[in-house]
């Protein structure tokens, strides 16, 4: 049987560049080499694209950049693949499916998806619109509200507004403290601060504004952090739910990736059966409301006192590192990492085949 040619995209111009490298290494190591011919395509923080043929271990360390061959992804629908530029000569490598492992802006926000749509190339994950909606936490929450799905109260602040601190304090008065200040367009909890009082607000606003001109200020809830993995196109399925018990006050960037395993990942989450089922049903409702394809990790907050569930956010390219919840939840639900990757690739082909091309 002829092997499918898979291009794994990693790196990117994003604050989550390093997380992408970790996820890509894990995915490449778990793709079945008997089924797939793998092409590793890295994007530097400067936006330079390279085809990398070296040791997978050098991806996570960043050493791959020294050994990459300058490349671009296609030039038209006639050339659906990787074009390289080496020693004055061009090379062309046809690709069957692209697996974007690009977390955050310029990868998870619809930009790469738009490029791949123009090239008519099958790709893993959500389409342009759904990717963009989920990348922007404000629009995600507005979709939740429109669909009648529960999400914490919030206020939106734009860059220049942070100069008028008193106006912001008045604007968020109804939220109370603690509250969370977040960049609207970033993942992995980069730039997020839990604000306990007015004195902590200016620093939190300045930090978030480093990453985005649009900021989300959200009511703080004394909550357990619950996550559920969703897989599928028209008929998605939800995994069992897991719970994160962070080593820090909340599951921030350092707790996610650099705390040496001090945060606890409880799989399955210690929930009553009916609450577990509620999580799974709500995850699928959120997935459908956002018209998602392929995969997503749906994150919840569950009020410790009332047990009420709130949708927090949706990640269309969730982490795939060795400690990431998305593959771990599926493994505990009966799908091995390699089987999960097989299904994602098949779903990408299915989505591509369903597109209308009559014009």
UniProtKB/Swiss-Prot annotation:
It is found in: Cytoplasm. GO terms for cellular component: cytosol. PROSITE patterns: ATP_GRASP, DALA_DALA_LIGASE_1, DALA_DALA_LIGASE_2. Its EC number is 6.3.2.4. It catalyses: 2 D-alanine + ATP = D-alanyl-D-alanine + ADP + phosphate + H(+). Pathway: Cell wall biogenesis; peptidoglycan biosynthesis. Its main location: cytoplasm. HAMAP family: Dala_Dala_lig (MF_00047). This is D-alanine--D-alanine ligase. The gene is ddl.
């Amino acid at each position: 049987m002829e092997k499918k040619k898979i291009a794994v995209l990693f790196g990117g111009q994003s604050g989550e560049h390093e997380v992408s490298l970790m996820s890509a290494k894990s995915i490449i190591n778990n793709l079945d080499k008997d089924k797939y011919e793998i092409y590793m395509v890295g994007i530097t923080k400067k936006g330079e694209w390279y085809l990398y043929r070296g040791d997978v271990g050098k991806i996570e360390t960043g050493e791959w950049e020294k050994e990459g061959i300058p490349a671009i992804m296609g030039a038209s629908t006639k050339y659906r693949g990787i074009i390289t530029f080496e020693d004055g000569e061009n090379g062309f490598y046809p690709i069957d499916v692209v697996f974007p492992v690009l977390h955050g802006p310029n990868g998870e926000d619809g930009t790469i998806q738009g490029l791949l749509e123009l090239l008519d190339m099958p790709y893993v994950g959500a389409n342009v619109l759904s990717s963009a909606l989920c990348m922007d936490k404000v629009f995600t929450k507005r979709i939740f509200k429109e669909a009648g799905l529960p999400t914490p109260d919030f206020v939106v602040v734009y860059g220049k507004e942070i100069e008028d601190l008193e106006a912001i304090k008045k604007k968020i008065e109804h939220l109370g403290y603690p509250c969370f200040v977040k960049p609207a367009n970033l993942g992995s909890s980069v730039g997020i601060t839990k604000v306990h009082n007015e004195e902590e607000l200016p620093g939190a606003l300045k930090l978030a504004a480093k990453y985005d001109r649009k900021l989300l200020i959200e009511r703080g809830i004394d909550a357990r952090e619950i996550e559920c993995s969703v897989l599928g196109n028209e008929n998605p399925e939800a995994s069992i739910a897991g719970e994160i018990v962070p080593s820090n006050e909340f599951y921030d960037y350092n707790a996610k990736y650099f705390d040496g395993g001090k945060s606890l990942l409880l799989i399955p989450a210690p929930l009553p059966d009916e609450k577990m089922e509620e999580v799974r049903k709500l995850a699928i409702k959120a997935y459908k409301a956002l018209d998602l394809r392929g995969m997503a990790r749906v994150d919840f907050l569950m009020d410790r006192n009332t047990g009420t569930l709130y949708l927090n956010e949706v990640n269309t390219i969730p982490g795939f590192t060795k400690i990431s919840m998305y593959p771990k939840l599926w493994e505990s639900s009966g799908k091995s990492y390699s089987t999960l990757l097989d299904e994602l690739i098949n779903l990408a082909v299915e989505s591509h085949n369903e597109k209308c091309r009559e014009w």
